[in-house]
A protein has these predicted regions:
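Active-site loop/oxyanion-hole signature of alpha/beta-hydrolase fold enzymes
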Residues: 80-126
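Conserved HGGG/HGGXW glycine-rich cap/lid loop of the alpha/beta-hydrolase fold
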Residues: 36-91
Length: 321
């Protein structure tokens, strides 16, 4: 019976190949010759101008859904994309897949699958790191780049994380250290400090958190996150711990927006430094946190729209260096 059902499904699939079937913008993109597939969705009419790279690693596209209330109304279409192992995409149980290099080339396969060229690449947090990597390897396909809430090296990231943790009380710091030394990052007392005092101050400064962000957390692939980053936003033990692209930023020539929240997890001085090193860039610091698309929403979306419109209209001007 299973074999018969599989044959029927394959016949239906073959018959539908040429059909003009509406999917609400969703499209699965095959990777590695069809071994895996990743989910994408176009929002707004064709042609879409932006491909979005979500954060994490392992944090699905859902938290970016607020873009739908701002970009299409300004005539800007974009693509969601859940990276392999995340959200609506295939989730293979293979830790060897969770590397920067493989994800960088995955983005290139997605670009080809969507038929994109001279497009704007948006990356938030880990997506910003991935955007930098893609730009350094495949810049000829980019029209512009948006790096949101990401610095150019993990050493700088960790240094600022320690500065932010240093603002906690001595008792709270001692409690965190006790559990970190024991490798117990799930202890309720540890989580209470991280979520109640650290994340609430620097990840998203809203109570309650927006529904799309909460939904993304429920779908979070922590296996990928733990492999690549570590146990949380402030303890880096994963395989991108040595990542550093400060010396390579000058190679990014396309118009670039570097944007971050002043109250987030990235050092504002590092964001300004990135702007000085990327020759054709604009730097914006909003009043928000790491998820500034929510807690500094109007500022953030205004700057995203302004950048896209300037690039598309040939009006973009870089900051004076």
């Amino acid at each position: 019976m299973r074999m018969t059902f599989a044959i029927v499904l394959s016949l239906f699939a073959a018959a539908a190949l040429g059909a003009d079937v509406k999917t609400g913008g969703s499209k699965m993109i095959p990777l590695d010759g069809g071994k895996y597939s990743v989910w994408t969705k176009q929002v707004g009419p064709a042609p879409a101008k932006i491909l979005t790279l979500h954060g994490g690693p392992g944090f699905p596209h859902d938290y970016l859904e607020c873009f739908e209330d701002f970009l299409p109304q300004k005539g800007i279409s974009f693509y969601y994309y859940d990276q392999l192992g995340v959200g609506n995409s295939d989730n293979p149980d293979d830790a060897s897949l969770w590397t920067i290099d493989r994800y960088r080339e995955e983005v290139e396969q997605v670009r080809k699958g969507l038929g994109l060229d001279q497009f704007i690449l948006y990356g938030h947090s880990w997506g910003g790191m991935l955007g930098i990597e893609y730009a350094l390897a495949h810049q000829d396909h980019l029209k512009a780049l948006i790096i949101s809430d990401m610095t150019a090296g993990i050493d700088a990231y960790e240094a600022y994380a320690q500065k932010l943790l240093g603002e906690l009380s001595e008792a709270d710091r001692a409690t965190l250290k006790k559990y970190e030394d024991a490798g117990n990052y799930e202890a309720p007392e540890y989580q209470e400090i991280m979520m109640g005092k650290v994340y609430s101050a620097h990840l998203v400064r809203l109570d309650p958190w927006p529904e799309p962000a909460l939904r993304a957390f429920k779908k979070f692939n922590t296996k990928i996150y733990n492999t690549m980053q570590g146990p949380n936003e402030f303890v880096i033990t994963g395989n991108f711990k040595e990542w550093d692209r400060w010396n390579d930023l000058s190679r990014i020539k396309v118009p670039t927006l570097v944007i971050a929240g002043r109250l987030g997890t990235m050092n504002p001085d590092d964001i300004k430094r990135m702007g000085k090193l990327i020759p054709n860039s604009r730097v914006v610091l909003t009043s928000g946190s790491h998820l500034e698309m929510y807690d500094a929403q109007d500022e953030y979306m205004r700057e995203i729209v302004r950048f896209v419109k300037d690039v598309e209209g040939g009006r973009f001007r870089a900051d004076k260096k």
